[in-house]
Amino acid sequence: MCTSLLVGKNATVDGSVICTQSSDCGNCDIRLEYVPAAVYQPGEMRVVKGWNVYDFLGTKGSPPVRSGPTITIPQVKQTYAYMATTFPFMNEHQVAIGEATLVGIRTELAPSENSDAKIRITDLSRIALERATTAREAINIMASLMEEHGFNAWNPNWMNLVPGGNDACGEYFAVADKDEVWCFEFLPVGSDWKKDSGEPGVCWCAMRIPDDMFAVNANESIIGEINLSDKDNFMASSNVKSLAIKHGWWDPKSGEPFRWDLAYTGKKANSLRTWRALSMVTPSQNLQPHADGYPMPIRPDKKLSILDIRKIHGDRLEGTEFDQTKGLAAGPFGSPNWPFGAPDQTRAIGTMSSDTIIINQCREWLPALIGGVMWVGLGGGDINLYVPFYAGITRLPKAYTTGVRTQFDWDSAFWVFELVGSWAQLNYVNMIKEIKAEQLRIESAELDRQAAIDEEAWKLYQEDPYLAREHLTNYCIENANEAVDSWRALANSLIAHYSFGTATTIEKFIAPEWWRKEISEKRK
């Protein structure tokens, strides 16, 4: 259950376009993958696999791959390099994608084994980044493939995403490039779709986020009214309205405008995560939780930075009535990671189930291989550390390509960050202060260096783009390795300092009085 943010270039402090994704599955792949560019011969085919959310490398000891249907499509002459985890996130032309599953769509749209629909999202988005040089092109590539071969959505019950929920879900991609960012939502078209029916195998709609606006997707549709005559800001499939009319979800004679969200989900986006993200960027609006929808996209009160975005992705509802660090479930030391099954448990943007969080930064004033930056955080947004990887790099640090979910590995970057996060649960209220201080120190230094790294890369690029790639690759590897070493040192310090509630100074961390009193009363 992911969260994705979209920010137009005039809503950021430096003119960057930003789109993000938190992979919150808790069992997705924890490694990064660099997929190089390639050239193909006429007549070659591209296998489209039915991967879901599991290990794409098939390393021994990994979770099993859950595959779906496989098809082949004609390969293109040239594919572009890109970076990925379970999902891809940016290519060498700084086309970027962030994903979130749409839950709660109409049950009649769920596909079945009788359907001819074959396309699933992991390889779909990879194909887009292999072939696209702009966001619009990426959307059209994906839409065309699904219209021809059908969108085969996975079942949220099968994935245990929504206990007691329905069997239908759709998908959302934030799709960005150096100039703009789009919200692209698409749905399956039912259990009986056939390829030879003459009907598209998907129902989709895309909305451009205005340059001075911000939006968030928290697993619910955020597209409302659409204006298909405004081709600069909207795109859609030919069945975008007819499918709703067919099922009785919208009547054009009613006088009511067509709303994508109401037609296909029956509601406007109003989750706690949606409210929290919007309220963090527009405190002046005084938005209230659980309203009947929110203005989306929205103009932020101030221009946003990378650090602002990382704060949103790490938010645990602190300072609100839903604060996860408060109350009996948080324990005496304020852990936001409540036990499963705790009453009144809320879902914050930050969560311990995050495998990776990617902040894609696209900048039009630089060549693509320099302008595109992927800020990668492994583990929960409150306890991880973001490191930059440029779009033009050709290699990755070993620590970021190592590790599986089923075995602790001190050489795996994910497990270093996960160890710090897990240990922090012993005394969160105190340890999180030390973690945040290290986050700010390292990430601020990375951002301070960015202009100098860009400038040197630009000088080398004018001489030979290969030299710029090597410069950026070496910097990213060195910086990432230093970051992991810093987090290993932090882990060593926290383990020694917070051992069974007693510090090496013999300072004891006593549970707060309110907690001791409440526990005492419950024992009576």
Each model region followed by its residue ranges:
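A short catalytic or substrate-binding loop motif that flags glycine-/basic-rich loops and adjacent residues
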Residues: 1, 165-167, 349-355
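A contiguous strand-loop segment
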Residues: 2-121, 141-303
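Second-shell loop/turn segments in exported
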Residues: 111-114, 124-132
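Accessory, solvent-exposed terminal regions and/or long lumenal/extracellular loops of proteins
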Residues: 265, 274, 279-343, 347-351, ...
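Substrate-recognition/cap regions that form aromatic- and gly/pro-loop-enriched pockets
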Residues: 333-462
